[in-house]
From Swiss-Prot:
GO terms for cellular component: plasma membrane. It comes from Anabaena sp. (strain L31). Belongs to the KdpC family. This is Potassium-transporting ATPase KdpC subunit. The system is composed of three essential subunits: KdpA, KdpB and KdpC. It is a single-pass membrane protein. Its main location: membrane. Part of the high-affinity ATP-driven potassium transport (or Kdp) system, which catalyzes the hydrolysis of ATP coupled with the electrogenic transport of potassium into the cytoplasm. This subunit acts as a catalytic chaperone that increases the ATP-binding affinity of the ATP-hydrolyzing subunit KdpB by the formation of a transient KdpB/KdpC/ATP ternary complex. The chain crosses the membrane at residues 13-33. The keyword Thylakoid does not apply.
Length: 200
């Protein structure tokens, strides 16, 4: 009899913990997230002026046009484009430093940057561990100002002002380095062009 009682008690405790961890806790987090942080809870999805999603401010993407700041290289190519690997996962290339394929990729990136008169700094030739970085360093963004200003036919000071506006500081003021959010900056450039055309 006591064995059955202990078994029923164990089942009851299991059901209570299942109810707490599988239903009550997730629902509480959902309500708090949607109530207090709806933008972040839904993936920080950015929309254009027509309310169409253009990407997440938390995940990098490819920008090939000369009018845009370019993101860091990605081993997964941000799951975009002809040579993308749409795996739905993040990650580096896992190529060893001695691997010729890695060296060839870096040399190719550096040569392409030199053709654009951009100094090949680390941020612009090395991919990150996640392969999905939404930010580039201030130095990497500064290297691209002239090219973007020329392509958009605006003064570099206008681009610099926007770049400073979309530079995120250190996390909790001490962790990491300041970085420029590439998607936010590129969309701000498009908005600026749109507003300039409307005012003409």
């Amino acid at each position: 009899m006591s064995l059955i009682r202990e078994l029923l008690r164990a089942i009851r405790i299991t059901l209570i913990f299942w109810l707490i961890t599988a239903i009550i806790y997730p629902l509480a987090i959902l309500v708090v997230g949607q109530g207090l942080f709806p933008y972040q809870a839904n993936g920080s999805i950015m929309q254009n002026i027509e309310a169409q999603p253009i990407g997440s401010a938390l995940i990098g993407q490819v920008f090939a046009s000369e009018q845009y700041f370019h993101s860091r290289p990605s081993a997964s190519r941000y799951s975009q484009g002809r040579r993308a690997r749409p795996t739905g996962i993040s990650g580096g290339s896992n190529l060893a430093p001695s691997n010729p394929a890695l060296l060839n990729r870096i040399i190719e990136e550096a040569n392409q940057l030199r053709e654009e008169n951009i100094q090949p700094i680390e941020d612009l030739i090395y991919s990150s561990g996640s392969g999905l970085d939404p930010h580039i360093s201030i130095q990497a963004a500064s290297q691209q100002i002239e090219r973007v200003a020329r392509a958009r036919n605006v003064q570099p000071d206008e681009i610099l002002r926007l770049m400073n506006k979309y530079t995120d500081g250190r996390f909790l003021w001490i962790f990491g380095e300041p970085g420029v959010n590439v998607l936010r900056l590129n969309y701000a450039l498009d908005l600026q062009d749109f507003n300039n055309q409307q005012n003409r």
